[in-house]
Each structure stands twice: as structure tokens, then as C-alpha cells.
Regions:
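C-terminal outer-membrane beta-barrel translocator/porin domains of Gram-negative envelope proteins
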Residues: 1, 107-192
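Solvent-exposed loop/turn segments connecting transmembrane beta-strands
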Residues: 1, 19-31, 53-63, 101, ...
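Outer-membrane beta-barrel initiation region
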Residues: 1-47, 101-105, 112-124
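Transmembrane beta-barrel strands of outer-membrane/channel proteins
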Residues: 3, 19-23, 47-53, 81-87, ...
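Transmembrane beta-barrel domains of outer membrane proteins
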Residues: 6-8, 34-38, 50-52, 68-72, ...
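Flexible, solvent-exposed coil segments and beta strand-coil junctions
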Residues: 9-16, 43-50, 85-95, 126-136, ...
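Gram-negative outer-membrane beta-barrel proteins
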Residues: 11-13, 25-27, 41, 55-59, ...
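Outer-membrane beta-barrel translocator/channel fold
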Residues: 51-72, 76, 82-105, 171-192
Length: 192
């Protein structure tokens, strides 16, 4: 099954609520829920929260939570400082060098720029998101300091009124002294 719901500005305060659930024949289950509340008390400050759950068949499950406090330069430019944590469970309890139970925590900083146009189907013409985090991973094997960088860029090239080329780039870098398979960044498929 598949569910992809996005509610934008339903309370007329600029809030965004997203809900995404996907379960496919490959025994993967993805659940993402997020809420963003901008301009709290009519100030340029806002908050957002995310919950991401990913289950890979009977191998492992990752649960990531994030809470960010943001400053809105304007509707197109935002800066967030936040806290992100992930808890991963090795469902088979093998706890070897490839897959293991772990918890990580990061202090994060995110800059977002989005350029919107008046197009009902594709209102987001340009998007640039840069996110970095500094923290540590604790597993049964060891504790490691970690740093990550994430860059997402997309742009729509309008050839004419009826034809658009959508360019999209997702980049992720994780610096660690060693890596566990269930902590690696996953992307791809029809949504990429």
C-alpha cells in the first residue's frame, strides 16, 4: 500500500503537515510524519518535528526523530537549529560488524531556500537544502563520534508551457571511524 498526504496552510498560519506510508512487496515499510509551524506568535520563529520509521524485512528497524527551532528570514529562506536521534534495532539479534543495535544523537543546523511559482501542479521551481550534524553513535560494539552533511538540490527547467525537465540531486556524507549497514543513508526509487 501507499499513502502520501500533504496539508498546507489549512489553519491559515503557514503550517505544513506531511504523512507518508509505503509498504511494498520487498518487505520494506516506510513511515514518515512531519509538522512545521512557522511564525509562532507572529514572530519569525517556528518549530518543526519529524518522525521517520524504516523497517527492512526481518533484518532491522530504524526510528528517527528530529525537533528543530527555526528562524524565517522570509517565506523562501529558513535556518533551523535542532536535535536529531535515531534508534536502530537488529531484529535478528545478530549484532555483528554489519548490522547492530545502535543509537545516535546529533545537534543539527539546516538552511533551506525554496523558490515558488504560480503553477498548481509543480509550485516549487527551485529547492536548496543544506543540513549538517555533529554527534555520536553508541552501539554494543563501540562508541563513535560522527559528522554528516546532506545537500538536496532540485530545479525545474521550463522548456515551454507544456514541457518541464525536473533536475534533482541528493547528496549525503557520513564521517565515522566505521559504518554499520543499518545506519547508512537510503534513497532511490520512484520518489527520487
Amino acid at each position: 500500500g501507499n499513502l502520501d498526504l500533504s496539508l498546507i496552510n489549512i489553519l491559515n498560519t503557514g503550517e505544513v503537515f506531511n504523512l507518508y506510508w509505503k509498504s511494498d512487496n520487498n518487505k520494506q515499510v516506510t513511515f514518515n510524519a512531519s509538522i512545521e509551524l512557522p511564525y509562532i506568535f507572529k514572530s519569525p520563529l517556528g518549530v518543526r518535528a519529524n518522525l521517520n520509521i524504516f523497517k527492512q524485512d526481518s533484518t532491522f528497524q530504524n526510528t528517527k526523530t528530529a525537533l528543530d527551532l527555526g528562524y524565517y528570514f522570509n517565506y523562501n529562506k529558513k535556518l533551523f537549529l535542532g536535535y536529531q536521534s535515531t534508534e536502530s534495532s537488529d531484529i535478528q539479534n545478530t549484532n555483528n560488524a554489519l548490522i547492530a543495535d545502535f543509537e545516535n544523537t546529533f545537534l543539527t543546523a539546516t538552511f533551506e531556500y525554496k523558490n515558488y511559482i504560480e503553477e498548481p501542479l509543480f509550485p516549487e521551481k527551485t529547492k536548496f537544502i543544506f543540513k549538517t550534524g555533529f554527534g555520536e553513535r553508541i552501539s554494543k560494539l563501540e562508541t563513535n563520534s560522527q559528522t554528516f552533511f546532506e545537500i538536496n538540490i532540485s530545479h525545474d527547467l521550463y522548456l515551454n508551457k507544456n514541457n518541464v525537465i525536473h533536475l534533482n540531486s541528493q547528496n549525503y556524507y557520513l564521517k565515522s571511524s566505521n559504518y554499520i549497514t543499518n545506519e547508512l543513508f537510503r534513497f532511490g526509487g520512484i520518489q527520487s
